UniProtKB/Swiss-Prot annotation:
Pathway: Amino-acid biosynthesis; L-arginine biosynthesis; L-arginine from L-ornithine and carbamoyl phosphate: step 2/3. InterPro entries: Arginosuc_syn_C, Arginosuc_syn_N, Arginosuc_synth, Arginosuc_synth_CS, Arginosuc_synth_type_1_subfam, AS_cat/multimer_dom_body, Rossmann-like_a/b/a_fold. This is Argininosuccinate synthase. Belongs to the argininosuccinate synthase family. Type 1 subfamily. ATP binds at A9, Y10, S11, G12, G13, L14, D15, T16, S17, G116. It comes from Bacillus thuringiensis subsp. konkukian (strain 97-27). It catalyses: L-citrulline + L-aspartate + ATP = 2-(N(omega)-L-arginino)succinate + AMP + diphosphate + H(+). Homotetramer.
Length: 401
């Protein structure tokens, strides 16, 4: 019987390495796909490892700039903070991984794609809904969800089949990282009362170890896109990396969160998102300067829905595409400079300016240079309060009667 081809999202870890052998037993030829999302792994090694374990072909694709410009940028412009805290680090990368899985599957003539998600996480939903949206005819295989092995059983299978066991396997943590940040769960973090140990963090310093003097960064934006740091122009992926280092040194972006997962359980997660939190903070302040009141007040409702759609794996849904169009329209005049103080875990905006600023000092000032028409206030108040006044008059008459 001819073997079918499957494209596997490959990380180099134990689960996806074992999945190669498991899929071989199911009569598949495995094509491994590893993406460089800015996590800092030795991906050349990961690519070769897939071949050594048994994949017939292995791809390593650098998608950092695509991830920055088409995924992280939208998240920043929409100020996506799930449940007010989590900037969607992992959720943002899943639709891009799904997109590349589908592209390689179509290119290679594969009939299926596979991922290494468990049956109790959000990522299985994000991958599979995205894949269905992009190519509903591809079979999706989830080996880890299907085999239901304990960790001990999985290690035993790996040893029996000569699958290399990672040297960091004894680490209690489950970590996912990309340009936009780092997520960490499992181990002691499963106890919501336990303080995260310092070795749970990598991108940020503890407050006790951060500099005792603040550092200032000036972030330049053009039409809602961060383009410069302290006067130096960067591609967006490099700007994010540079800001991760700057803000992380000051302990910015540590998040300890008990979140409501899509699959119905609560999960305690620890995140590090120094650049994401700094950029979201700065961008929001520039919007406050440049957006008209009606748009500024309406946009958070759209942001909330976009955040939910991305978290729930609906990146490729029609509603998300429609809301993205609204978001892009709001960014046309979000151009300017924001000065941010990085100090002891905080990113504090201390200045903002824009050629499209709607702040008029002559109207806002209380000095002799005031140009606001105070006489207009009387008529405005009369008309603005008229519905309330009429309602009160009518109901007071009923009480008196």
């Amino acid at each position: 019987m001819d073997k079918k081809k499957v494209v596997l999202a490959y990380s180099g870890g134990l689960d996806t390495s074992v999945a190669i052998k498991w899929l071989q037993e199911k009569n598949y030829d495995i094509i491994a796909l590893c993406l460089d999302l800015g996590e800092g792994k030795d991906l050349a090694f990961v690519k070769e490892k897939a071949l050594s374990v048994g994949a017939i072909k292995s791809y390593m694709i650098d998608v950092q700039e695509e991830f920055a410009n088409e995924y992280a940028l939208m998240a920043m412009q929409a100020h996506t903070l799930y449940e007010g805290k989590y900037p969607l680090v992992s959720a943002l990368s899943r639709p891009l991984i799904a997109k590349k899985l589908v592209e390689i599957a179509e290119q290679e003539g594969a009939t299926a794609v596979a991922h290494g998600c468990t049956g109790k996480g959000n990522d299985q939903v994000r991958f599979e809904v995205s894949i269905q949206a992009l190519n509903p005819y591809l079979e999706v295989i989830a080996p880890v969800r299907e085999w239901k092995w304990s960790r001990e059983e999985e290690i035993a299978y790996a040893k029996e089949n000569n699958v290399p066991i990672p040297i960091n396997l004894d680490s209690p943590f489950s970590i996912d990282q990309n340009l936009w940040g780092r997520s960490n769960e499992c181990g002691i973090l499963e106890d919501p009362w336990a303080a995260p140990p310092e070795d749970a963090y990598e991108m940020t310093l503890a407050l006790e170890d951060t500099p005792n003097k603040p550092e200032f960064v000036e972030i330049g934006f053009e039409a809602g896109v961060p383009t410069t740091l302290n006067g130096t122009a960067y591609p967006l992926s490099e700007l994010i990396k540079t800001l991760n280092a700057l803000a992380g040194k000051h302990g910015v972006g540590r998040i300890d969160h008990v979140e409501n997962r899509l699959v119905g359980i609560k999960s305690r997660e620890v995140y590090e998102c120094p650049a994401a939190m700094t950029l979201i903070t700065a961008h929001k302040e520039l919007e406050d300067l440049t957006l008209v009141k009606e748009v500024a007040h309406f946009k958070p409702m759209i942001e909330q829905k976009i955040t939910e759609l991305i978290y729930n794996g609906l990146w490729f849904s029609p509603l998300k595409q429609a809301l993205h169009a609204f978001l892009q329209e709001t960014q046309k005049n979000v151009t300017g400079m924001v000065r941010v103080k990085l100090f002891k875990g905080h990113a504090i905006v201390e200045g903002r300016k824009s050629e499209y600023s709607l702040y008029d000092e002559k109207l806002a000032t209380y000095t002799a240079q005031d140009e606001f028409n105070h006489d207009a206030a009387v008529g405005f108040i009369s008309l603005f309060g008229l519905p309330t006044k009429v309602y009160s008059q009518v109901n007071q008459k009923k009480v008196e009667a």
